[in-house]
Structures are given as structure tokens and as C-alpha cells.
């Protein structure tokens, strides 16, 4: 297994960013796995063959610069609302960035532990380009979007104490995923969304019976390798079953963390991306983040889009009621533009 992971190399373009594709590339090629002939030249040009082989895909220019800037502003709004001494324009005030009341996750750079419901965050979740990326890879247009967190990595060359924890993990229990799905369905059936944290819980209950499941990160600033951020273990999806059948099963945790000595951690690669890019990966892929080692901050929004067919009618209604209530009771969301795509993705149909 180690030799397989060791064989994967990620090319870097002439601006120092990891291999990426355009939205047009998604249209210019067909997503037909039967045409995969393992030709490395095709993988470099065809986004679907690249995704099939590597297990992840970077698409550039998905979110506009203006929308990225608005999202960055909303992240700073969250921080400044919690930490009164923090000033986004003065790095000397960044020593205390994360609130001490348990509503942040400082070790991973998350200013908000609950999912974020701000206008631009919802605009990004329902952005037609984002929807296009997921629908093309899933070969499915009947999709819904999750509600997740964001991250802010401070520049550690300004202050080494701002370092976040390196981590590689799965947002699922691999043994429940490989099972018949009963455990996952039971957990999902308990969700009423009375607590906002239940929107996070739903992310971690995929099953192989649901087919391909995708996660993503929307990159909000130019992000070079030393700026820290997203990492993934290319090709791991090809050895997923073999790897976990060689381990002692454990069914209780909703996620799986890899030790630094593990091959999944050892062969994880930092994926550098331009502002406005999105990286999407097969949920079977070990992924996580590496800490910042530069003068530049990192900001990103987390996202998952999944087939509506994986949500039963009772849970759909609970979810719909909560989303509708959140929008109607928020001054900044009352005028949120609902159309065919956004209503479908938010589960408001």
C-alpha cells in the first residue's frame, strides 16, 4: 500500500500553485469513468480522469474576487464580534483572535465552532459555479448543500505562537462507511436540527450505499505552499478498503484521525491554490491541514454538496424548517435571493 501512495506526485504550475483545472475543462471533457485508460497525459488534461486517479480536484476561478473579499470580511466580522480587542487591519491585535468561551476551535483556526450563517457564506454555498463543480463530478443535478465552518490561519513568521495543529483525518467512520449503512442511517434519523451543531453531524455519516460523496474547501486568499492549509493523501481511495480491513475495527467515533507515523499522514500533500479556487475530494480521502510557515494569512470556507436522495422526507422537513427560520429571523438574510438552484440546494423546496 505504501508504494502506491509513494508513487503519486502533484505537479506545480509556473506560479507555484498545485495542478488545477478551469470550469471550461469540466464542459470540454465527458465524465465517463469507462473511458479511463490510465494515460498520464490524459490525467493532466482531463479533470475527470485526474479526479478518478488522484481522488481530488482543484478548479480555479469558481468564486469571484469580490465574493472572496466579502467572505473574508464576514470571517473578520465574526472574530471582531467575539474579541473586542481584535482589529482586522492591525496584526499587533491578532494575538487574541479566538474567543475563550468555547465557541471557537483555535487549534484548527476556526473562529466559529457552530456552522456559519452569514449572507456571503450562503451565497457561496449556492453559487452556480460551485454547484456546477459538484453536479459534474457527481453526475447528479438534484443536490443539497451543507452548512459548515471557516478557518483563519495567522502568519506564524509574525508570531510563532499562532501555529495551528497539523492534522490528517477522515470526516467519517470508515467501518460504518463499509458496513450496510444501518448505523449511519440511525444517526441521521435522530437529527432535528434544533441545535446548529447537527448541521456538522450530518457531514460525518456517509455510507458506501450512498455512492460517491464529496467535500470541498473554497479558497479565499492566494495560498502558496508555506501559507499552510489544505492537504490530502493522493490515491488513498484506491487502497481504502485494503487499508482499513488490515486495522482493528472501531465503530463509535464519527471521524478518524491518522497518526503522524501513518502512511496516510506521511504521504499527505499540501495543495496550494489561487484565490477563488475550490478543491473537491472523495470523502474517502484522508485530508486536513498543515500549519502556516509564512507572513501570509490563510482563509477558507468548508463545504459539502450531496444528493438529495440521501435525505429522507422526515429529516428533509426538519432541516427545511430550521433553514427557513434562520433566514426569516436574520436581518441580513431576509433579502437572501432565492431561485431554483438556491432553493433546491438549501432544501427549501
UniProtKB/Swiss-Prot annotation:
Listed SUPFAM superfamilies: Clavaminate synthase-like
Keywords: Dioxygenase, Iron, Metal-binding, Oxidoreductase
Annotated binding of 2-oxoglutarate, by residue: 118, 169-171
Pathway as given in its UniProt record: Lipid metabolism; fatty acid metabolism
Annotated EC: 1.14.11.18
Catalytic activities: phytanoyl-CoA + 2-oxoglutarate + O2 = 2-hydroxyphytanoyl-CoA + succinate + CO2
Pfam families: PhyH
Gene Ontology MF terms in the entry: metal ion binding; phytanoyl-CoA dioxygenase activity
Enzyme category, top tier: oxidoreductase
Any GO BP annotation: fatty acid metabolic process
Cofactor entry: Fe cation; L-ascorbate
Superkingdom to which the source organism belongs: Eukaryota
Coiled coil: none
Positions bound to Fe cation: 169, 171
Cited function: Converts phytanoyl-CoA to 2-hydroxyphytanoyl-CoA.
Family: Belongs to the PhyH family.
The protein's name: Putative phytanoyl-CoA dioxygenase
Lineage, highest ranks first: Eukaryota, Amoebozoa, Evosea, Eumycetozoa, Dictyostelia
Amino acid at each position: 500500500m505504501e508504494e502506491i501512495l509513494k508513487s503519486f506526485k502533484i505537479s506545480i504550475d509556473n506560479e507555484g500553485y498545485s495542478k488545477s483545472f478551469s470550469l471550461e475543462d469540466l464542459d470540454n471533457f465527458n465524465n465517463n469513468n469507462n473511458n479511463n485508460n490510465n494515460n498520464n497525459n490524459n490525467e493532466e488534461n482531463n479533470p475527470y480522469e485526474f479526479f478518478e486517479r488522484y481522488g481530488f480536484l482543484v478548479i480555479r476561478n469558481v468564486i469571484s474576487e469580490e465574493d472572496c473579499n466579502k467572505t473574508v470580511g464576514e470571517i473578520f466580522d465574526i472574530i471582531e464580534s467575539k474579541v473586542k480587542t481584535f482589529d482586522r487591519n492591525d496584526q499587533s491585535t491578532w494575538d487574541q483572535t479566538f474567543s475563550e468561551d468555547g465557541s471557537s476551535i483555535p487549534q484548527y483556526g476556526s473562529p466559529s465552532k457552530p456552522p456559519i450563517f452569514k449572507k456571503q457564506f450562503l451565497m457561496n454555498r449556492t453559487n452556480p459555479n460551485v454547484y456546477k463543480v459538484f453536479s459534474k463530478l457527481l453526475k447528479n443535478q438534484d443536490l443539497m448543500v451543507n452548512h459548515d465552518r471557516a478557518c483563519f490561519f495567522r502568519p506564524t513568521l509574525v508570531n510563532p505562537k499562532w501555529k495551528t495543529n497539523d492534522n490528517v483525518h477522515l470526516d467519517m467512520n470508515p467501518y460504518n462507511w463499509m458496513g450496510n449503512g444501518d448505523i449511519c442511517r440511525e444517526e441521521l434519523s435522530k437529527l432535528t436540527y434544533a441545535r446548529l451543531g447537527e448541521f456538522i453531524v450530518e457531514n460525518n455519516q456517509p455510507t458506501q450505499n450512498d455512492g460517491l460523496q464529496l467535500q470541498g474547501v473554497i479558497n479565499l486568499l492566494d495560498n502558496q505552499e508555506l501559507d499552510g492549509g489544505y492537504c490530502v493523501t493522493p490515491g488513498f481511495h484506491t487502497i481504502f478498503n485494503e487499508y482499513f480491513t488490515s486495522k482493528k475495527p472501531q465503530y463509535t467515533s464519527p471521524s478518524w484521525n491518522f497518526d503522524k507515523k501513518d502512511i496516510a499522514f506521511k504521504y499527505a500533500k499540501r495543495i496550494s491554490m489561487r484565490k477563488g479556487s475550490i478543491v473537491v475530494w472523495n470523502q474517502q480521502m484522508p485530508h486536513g491541514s498543515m500549519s502556516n510557515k509564512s507572513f501570509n494569512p490563510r482563509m477558507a470556507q468548508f463545504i459539502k454538496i450531496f444528493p438529495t436522495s440521501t435525505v429522507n422526507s422526515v429529516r428533509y422537513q426538519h432541516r427545511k424548517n430550521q433553514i427557513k427560520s434562520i433566514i426569516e429571523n436574520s436581518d441580513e438574510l431576509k433579502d437572501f435571493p432565492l431561485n431554483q438552484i438556491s432553493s433546491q440546494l438549501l432544501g427549501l423546496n
